[in-house]
Design a protein with these regions (language model features):
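Radical SAM enzyme [4Fe-4S]-AdoMet core and its adjacent flexible, acidic
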Residues: 1, 47, 113-117, 122-263, ...
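Conserved alpha-helical substructure of the radical SAM core
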Residues: 1-118
Length: 406
C-alpha cells in the first residue's frame, strides 16, 4: 500500500486502534505543572483488576498491537505488574511511561527479561534545574537513578520522553547525548494546553523562533529521534517529519482513562471528546465501532476537507499540517476548523490575540494535590529545602480497592 493510500486509510479510521493510551491511575507522587491529566490523587472509581483484564481481553480480540500505559504514575498501582504480565501473555504489547519512582534494580531486571514490554522515562530537561522546575524537586535524580538501573540490567533501547518547552529547546543536543550515553532512544513530544498544562501553556510553550529551531533539529536527525504525532503542525517549514503526520484522534488512537471513560485523544480530556465507557454494554469494542463522536471525526468534513472545510482549508500548506492539533486549538479557545495556536505562518498567534482565555474550555477533571494553578519557577534554586510534593498519600484507598478487585 502506498503512503498516501495508507494515510487515507488512517484518516477514515481503522477496525481497531494501532495503539491506545491507557491511564491506569490518577495517583502520582509528582505534581508536574504541565500534566495532561491533572494527576495526583487516586480516583476511587478506578477500574478494578478484573475490569482491566476484561479490557485487555477485548484488545486481544481486536488485535490491538500495543497499549501505551500511563497515568498518573502507573507503577504505583499494586496490580501494575500483574496487569503487564496479563497483557503480554495475551499478545498485547505494553509500553509504559514512568517518572522512575518504582524502577529499582529488581524492576529493571524484570523489564530487561521481557521482549514485549518497553519503558519510557519522563525527563523534561538535561539538567536538574530545568527538569525539576516543571516536574518537581528531586525528580531529575529519580529519573537518572531509574535509567542507571535499566542500563545496569542490560535493557537496551528504552526511551527518554521529553515534553518540549521554551526552557529545554536549547538542550536538544544535551538530551540526545544523554540518551546515547544510556543506549536509549530520545522521544520528543509537544506541550499541549491540556490538564494542568492549560494553566502553564502560555508560559512554557516554545516561541516561534524556537519552533523553527526544533523543526530544523528534528529534520537533521531523521528517524534517530521519535516524535509520534507531535509535530506535524511544523511540516510547512519544509516537509513532513518522521512519524504520524496527521491527527489520529478517534481514527487510529484514543484514550481510556482510569475510570474507563474513552476519549478521542489523550490530550482532549473533556466531555466534548468523550466517546463512551468500557463499562457500557459491548465494552471498548462497541465504543470504537459505534461511537457517534468517532464516526464524526472520521468524516472528511471533520478534517477540514471538502465543501464543509474550515478556515485552514484554503491555505497552501493545509496538506502538510492538516490544520494542526485539535486539543491545542480547543483548550486555547480557538475554533476547531481554524489554525493551530502554533501555526508556523503566525495565523494561530493572531487568533490567540482575539481569543478570550477566560472563556476557553477547561479540562474536565482535576485530581491535583493542589487545587490552584502551580507557578512555573525557572531560575536560581531556593536556599531552603524543597517543600513536600503533596500532603497526602497518593496511594490512599489502594489497599481496600485492590482487595475488593480480587
Amino acid at each position: 500500500m502506498t503512503v498516501p493510500r495508507l494515510v487515507e486509510q488512517f484518516e477514515l479510521g481503522l477496525d481497531a486502534p494501532i495503539c491506545l493510551t491507557w491511564e491506569l491511575t490518577y495517583a502520582c507522587n509528582l505534581a508536574c505543572v504541565h500534566c495532561l491529566s491533572s494527576s495526583g490523587r487516586r480516583d476511587p472509581r478506578e477500574l478494578t483488576t478484573a475490569e482491566c483484564k476484561d479490557v485487555i481481553d477485548t484488545l486481544q480480540r481486536m488485535q490491538v498491537f500495543y497499549v501505551n500505559i500511563g497515568g498518573g504514575e502507573p507503577t504505583v498501582r499494586p496490580d501494575f505488574w500483574e496487569l503487564v504480565d496479563y497483557a503480554t501473555a495475551h499478545q498485547v504489547g505494553v509500553k509504559f511511561s514512568t517518572n522512575g519512582i518504582k524502577v529499582d534494580a529488581g524492576a529493571a531486571l524484570r523489564l530487561a527479561a521481557s521482549d514485549y514490554v518497553d519503558v519510557q522515562i519522563s525527563l523534561d530537561g538535561a539538567t536538574a534545574e530545568v527538569n525539576d522546575a516543571v516536574r518537581g524537586a528531586g525528580s531529575y535524580a529519580t529519573a537518572v537513578r531509574a535509567m542507571d538501573n535499566l542500563k545496569a540490567a542490560g535493557f537496551a533501547g528504552f526511551k527518554i520522553s521529553v515534553v518540549m518547552t521554551r526552557h529545554n529547546i536549547g538542550q536538544l543536543d544535551q538530551l540526545k547525548a544523554l540518551a546515547d550515553s544510556y543506549g536509549a532512544q530520545l522521544r520528543l513530544t509537544r506541550l499541549r494546553p491540556s490538564g494542568r498544562g492549560a494553566d502553564t501553556w502560555h508560559q512554557l510553550h516554545p516561541e516561534a523562533g524556537q519552533q523553527r529551531q526544533l523543526y530544523d533539529w528534528l529534520a537533521s536527525r531523521g528517524e534517530q529521534v521519535l516524535t509520534g504525532d507531535s509535530f506535524f503542525h511544523l511540516a510547512p517549514y519544509g516537509g513532513p517529519l518522521p512519524g504520524l503526520n496527521l491527527c489520529g484522534a478517534g481514527r487510529v488512537v484514543c484514550l481510556i482513562d482510569p475510570v474507563g471513560d474513552v476519549y478521542a485523544c489523550p490530550f482532549a480530556i473533556h466531555e466534548e471528546f468523550l466517546a463512551g465507557s468500557v463499562r457500557q454494554a459491548g465494552g471498548f469494542e462497541a465504543v470504537w465501532r459505534d461511537s457517534a463522536l468517532f464516526a464524526e471525526l472520521r468524516r472528511p468534513a471533520a478534517r477540514g476537507e471538502g465543501e464543509a472545510g474550515g478556515a485552514c482549508r484554503s491555505c497552501e500548506f493545509f496538506d502538510s499540517c492538516r490544520g494542526g492539533c485539535m486539543a491545542a486549538k480547543f483548550f486555547t479557545g480557538l475554533p476547531l476548523d481554524g489554525p493551530d495556536p502554533e501555526c508556523v505562518r503566525g495565523y494561530g498567534a493572531e487568533a490567540l490575540k482575539a481569543a478570550d482565555p477566560v472563556t476557553a474550555p477547561r479540562p474536565a477533571l482535576d485530581h491535583s494535590h493542589r487545587s490552584a494553578p502551580v507557578p512555573v519557577m525557572i531560575g536560581p534554586r531556593p536556599g531552603g529545602p524543597p517543600g513536600r510534593a503533596c500532603d497526602e498519600n497518593p496511594l490512599a484507598g489502594f489497599a481496600a480497592a485492590a482487595s475488593r478487585s480480587r
